[in-house]
Amino acid sequence: VQPQLPPDSIIDAEGCYLLPGVIDEHVHFRDPGLTAKGNFYTESRAAAAGGVTTVIDMPNTVPPTVTKERLLQKIEIAQQQSLVNFGFFLGATPDNAARLKDVNPRLVAGIKLFMGSSTGELQVEDRPTLRTIFEQSQLPIMVHCEDTPMITAKMKAYKKKYGEDPHVRYHAEIRPSEACVKSTKEAIALAREFNVKLHVAHITTAAELDLFDPNDKQITAEACLPHLMFASEDYERLGARIKCNPAVKYDTDRAAIRAALTDGRIRTIGTDHAPHRISDKIGGAAKATSGMPFVQFSLVSMLELVDEGVLPIERMVELMCHNPARVFGIENRGFLRQGYMADLVLIKPHSPWTLPPNRIESKCNWSPMEGHTFNWRVMRTFVNGRLVYNKGVITNENLRGRMITYMPR
């Protein structure tokens, strides 16, 4: 910045850190069709309040984002509602698998593939369709890896033993490490065979981490906040609030994922932000819905891990800002550089505060972090150079983010 330029305004940032705005490459903002849970307006407010300036939304909406027409519909919704920048994944299905080579690379961050049942009806399991998807895709594939037959058999056995809705404490046993590892191995083998860039979503197990090479730019892995912050013992305290797919697993898995943040096996951090009405979270491993809101508290939660010595703040910025831009080829975002968009977040350390329900911006109005005391605060968030969030307040309800653009990949 040229020092002789006159400032439009002066911001007191004494004692603060200025970072690139967070790029959350894994959110479910629920538009269209699931707006009782959240929408682009409410969830982008939560993002802005958390220092997240760019999000990439997943395709398992109603209807699912699996055609150009539905993608354009979602783009229009985001343009009208989103306070932060936005991008999208196109869902892979048996119906569109043979046409994935024709997807406009300027419109999407990549292809989302569900190799395992989760929320929505997008899972693809038959081998011929999977091969077609990997053969046809010209874009990065982000994949949810779990083996559904293994999970189905486990659920049947646990229902026989514990009744129709086993306690949520069994969720990690019903969706075990073996199901993740088997599916991840298959996805990696297909990516190697067809020379496709693969990003494996939400790693949950220590065993999966052995499948990744820190120096491999083709095959990469994501960690998500639920699996970094929680472990199986937290089911007793938080119940189905932390039920998600893949499941929050064991303390040894969490420790391994945290260690992989610094050795390069984890390339990005996302939230898998997936709001549900609190009434939908009643029940156990079978009946409670899977997913939790997290986009508002991802940055301050990761800064706690910085304070605990899990990773340095520079590495956190790489995982949450730089690398999402690199992996998906996002243009002019993710870095504090001349010529880049001014997506910025100002954060302050040594400023403890405890989360009350009335500070939650997500439409669902609950968080697994309620009652938690954070040591960092998001002071201000700037999206495209404009102040969107200032010390607890959305500054202008009419500001809108932009659709992100991509470099050749």
Predicted regions mapped to residue ranges:
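Histidine-rich, glycine-flanked metal-binding segment
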Residues: 1-19, 404
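Metal-associated gating/positioning segment near the N- to mid-region
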Residues: 13-81
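Divalent metal-coordination and catalytic microenvironments
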Residues: 15, 26, 47, 51, ...
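Histidine-centered catalytic micro-motifs
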Residues: 21-32, 142-146, 203, 271
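A glycine-rich helix N-cap at a beta->alpha junction
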Residues: 76-92
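Histidine/acidic residue-rich metal-binding segments in metalloenzymes
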Residues: 98-269
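His/Asp/Glu-enriched, well-ordered alpha-helical/loop segment
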Residues: 165-195, 241, 262, 267-269, ...
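C-terminal cap of metal-dependent C-N hydrolases
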Residues: 284, 338-404
